[in-house]
Amino acid sequence: MSETVHNRIAVLRAERGISRRQLADALGVHYQTIGYLERGEFRPSLHLALRIAAYFEVPVEVVFSIEPFPRIGGAAVENRRSA
């Protein structure tokens, strides 16, 4: 069973002004691993997922989901189109 794991790593990094390299260094992984994770090309181990959540000080379900995350501003755009 090959399920996609969706994540908000790029959003969390951008909100905090953290580069891929800075996050990778803090987690002890190669910076390209962060890019692979963000693009959905690599599924993290449970241990790495928990470490990423701990780094951002949020619950793991804020960072990772098997369901796509709603687009930011998507509802606002739809509401404006309906009006």
Language model segments and positions:
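A short, Lys/Arg-rich alpha-helix, primarily the initiator
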Residues: 1-15
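Recognition helix of helix-turn-helix/homeodomain-like DNA-binding domains
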Residues: 29-42
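Alpha-helical residues within the helix-turn-helix
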Residues: 14, 25, 54
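Conserved hydrophobic/aromatic packing and binding residues within compact polymer-binding modules
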Residues: 9, 23-24, 34-37, 63
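DNA major-groove recognition helix of helix-turn-helix/homeodomain DNA-binding modules
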Residues: 47-62
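Short, charged recognition helix plus adjacent turn
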Residues: 54, 64-83
